[in-house]
Amino acid sequence: MRFFLLASLLTMTMAQAPATVRTVPAVDLDRYAGDWFEVARYPNWFQRTCAGDVRASYARQPDGRIEVVNRCTRSDGSVIDARGVARVIDVQTRAKLKVRFAPAVLSFLPFVWGDYWIIGLADDYTWAVVGSPDRKYLWILARTPRLDAAAFDRAVAAASANGFDAGRLTRNK
């Protein structure tokens, strides 16, 4: 009985997610800038009305920040967008950013900034995996509306290697 309990404890410990989420080693923000399509995501409250055609556009700014425009189509056909700004918080890799969609006047408040960590990235920048260090948020993005099965599997593998539950992903139509 003691052996069974010890074996069970070891198995549960080994099956847990990695202690920390790891980003990619380096991101070229000029190559990363541009338009991305959301291929899959964890369900979240701020995208609850998005029914399809979910996109993100990133544009480098002279001050080093990144202009962010997120857009999606609702089920009634109307388009909504959210404009924000991102800033690099890890200058070594440029893979950890903070993003805010709150008005600039509130930017001094830490809670208006959300984590945007690039945890997977194709060598040719055709797909990216973005998550948060608490593993509550996850997105798979691509330069085209669809990813082929092999590329999607590589993106999911990057998320899974960081302890994200691939079963929670919802794919866009």
Regions found by a protein language model. Name each.
Residues 2-3, 10-173:
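A beta-rich soluble binding module of mature secreted/lumenal proteins
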